[in-house]
Amino acid sequence: MQNHYNLVYREEEREMNPYCLSTGVDLTPWSPLARGILAGSYQGGFSGGSTDRSKGQDRQRTEGLYHGDHVFPIAERVIEIAAKYDKTPAQIAVAWLFHKPGVTSPVVGVSKVAQLEQLVAAVEIQLAEEDLYYLEELYRPVDNLLSIGFS
């Protein structure tokens, strides 16, 4: 099942991931780097875009998908954990996915062979339980119609 799933968007954990696990369907998450946020492309907020892509029209798309006070603090934690393991933030974001049950092959977008090689190497990264908790604890579910009083 190709689902939207990463450290700053984990809504699939509510229903879809458990359903897929119970029926034997593997997960192939798209946007594992949250359009560059988890790779460190927007340090300090959306105005801090560091690449041509994150400064251009992609910024508006990214802001539309990822909003909330938790987004950039989570990204900062990814950067911290990356430094601890001597890895890139992108590797840590993908390694986190490989620690989640059912995830077999995140769908990544790269522009250079070296980026792909780094992300493939993330398969080998073993994150400590306390680091997984540290990465996950700031997440806040996205408001949806049910959570704001519509039914």
Indicate residue ranges for each PLM-predicted region:
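Beta/alpha (TIM)-barrel catalytic core signal, keyed to glycine-rich beta->alpha loops juxtaposed to Asp/Glu
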Residues: 1-137, 142
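Short coil/turn segments at secondary-structure boundaries
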Residues: 147-151
